[in-house]
Amino acid sequence: MDKIIKSISKNGHFRAFALDSTLTVREAQERHQTWPTSTVALGRTLIAAQVLGANEKGDTKITVKVLGDGAMGPIIAVADSKGHVKGYVKNRELDYKKASTGEVLVAPFVGNGFLVVVKDMGLKQPYSGQVDLITGEIGEDLAWYFLSSEQTPSSVGVNVLLNEDSDTVKIAGGFMLQALPDATDEEITEIEHNIKSMPSIATMLTSDEPLKTMLDNIYGDMEYKNLGEFPLAFKCDCSKERFLEGIKSLGREPIEEMIAEDHGAEIICQFCENKYEYSEEELKALIN
């Protein structure tokens, strides 16, 4: 089971999340049949959305949009405060690796553009924040969002490691660290040093206790306490009934065309690839 550990330094000056999102990203890859570069980019965006969702409470939903001008096209992920996330990438068929190391390349295919974060708290108007993509690697872009839009100094690392022989997801996860208002400059410098000198995310994720390893490396000599473990999962909230309401909202004329030309309708959810079929009778019931 995927999970996130939330923690805070004992002096209350920093908080950090560590995530194992392996099954989440693996399911996304299987559902969308993504190629390696697309898998890593989508996976990082899903993890970023889970990080943001973990910051929220209640029924708030977070949408993360990576809107670059590269070959990848838009990457969209939607998460809630309960650890659920869904998402998709427009171009699923990108497979580019460094010849020397086999490292999957992401940023060149995301390109230049924007990271958009939308918070829907069930009020009339969702909150929306937007920053320029500074690297296209997604983790650094999310850290820039926290600093620019929420004035919170942060460090974010997200990654997806693929099996060399099959390009399936081997492991996926990441971390987020935030400095809270009482953090001193000296403490921030110490934490920055810890993060710069820590092993790669891939190395930590393949350790025996990946989430503890990440948190130990982040805090270094600073004492911290765990605030709890919480489950994470790929989960889409689509349903046949919800899409039926969407068809109904189209109005009489388009529905009559579906009945006359196709004798029914088929809808595929772009977030999870679930397929829903509607009979002629079900469509007629919408307009009678």
From Swiss-Prot:
Keywords in alphabetical order: Chaperone, Cytoplasm, Disulfide bond, Redox-active center, Zinc
Molecular functions per Gene Ontology: protein folding chaperone; unfolded protein binding
Any one GO BP annotation for this protein: protein refolding
Predominant localisation class: cytoplasm
Disulfide-bonded cysteines: C236-C238, C269-C272
GO cellular component terms, A-Z: cytoplasm
PTM comment text: Under oxidizing conditions two disulfide bonds are formed involving the reactive cysteines. Under reducing conditions zinc is bound to the reactive cysteines and the protein is inactive.
Places the protein is found: Cytoplasm
Function: Redox regulated molecular chaperone. Protects both thermally unfolding and oxidatively damaged proteins from irreversible aggregation. Plays an important role in the bacterial defense system toward oxidative stress.
NCBIfam families (UniProt xref): PRK00114.1
Similarity section: Belongs to the HSP33 family.
Protein name: 33 kDa chaperonin
Organism listed in the record: Lactococcus lactis subsp. cremoris (strain SK11)
Source species taxonomy: Bacteria, Bacillati, Bacillota, Bacilli, Lactobacillales
Gene: hslO
